[in-house]
Amino acid sequence: MKNILIISSSPRKKGNSQILCEQFQKGAEAKGYQVNIVRIMEKNIGFCRACDGCMRNGGTCVLKDDMAEILEMFQKADVLVLATPVYFFGISAQMKTFIDRTYPIWQHLGKKEVYYIISAGLGEDIIERSLGDLDGFVEHLEEYRIAGK
């Protein structure tokens, strides 16, 4: 059974990208997959300080917040879903913070299948920019497959 982790970076509980996450979850659970949604706005996640403390501490960040729990879920997941609204022509600040905080483990994640959920109101070119942001992160994972590419 596949273990799916959805990272929802919408700051709005009933925002469009959050609704899409919930629909993805329903469909995956109907197929028998285990699904966890992490709503970043409901977690205490500090900004990366670029101190390299995690590199000196065997991959453990010096910040004591909810990110350690999320990274553990991230490592165990077979499938990763990154969901973001587009704000001011790019991924949400919450998604960027999440990506930055994966620094201690991003090179040691193993094989992942990755999906994106991006919601925007301004058109396809705006979504393309956000795809570039997410691709820049995912393409540096150890072993990945972006679904649909």
Annotate each PLM feature.
Residues V86-F88, G121-L122:
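Short glycine-rich anion-binding loops that position phosphate/pyrophosphate groups of nucleotides
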Residues M1-A83, F89-D100, P104, E139-I146:
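N-terminal beta1-alpha1-beta2 submodule of the flavodoxin-like/Rossmannoid cofactor-binding fold
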Residues Q94, W106-G148:
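Short, glycine-/small-residue-rich phosphate/pyrophosphate-handling segment
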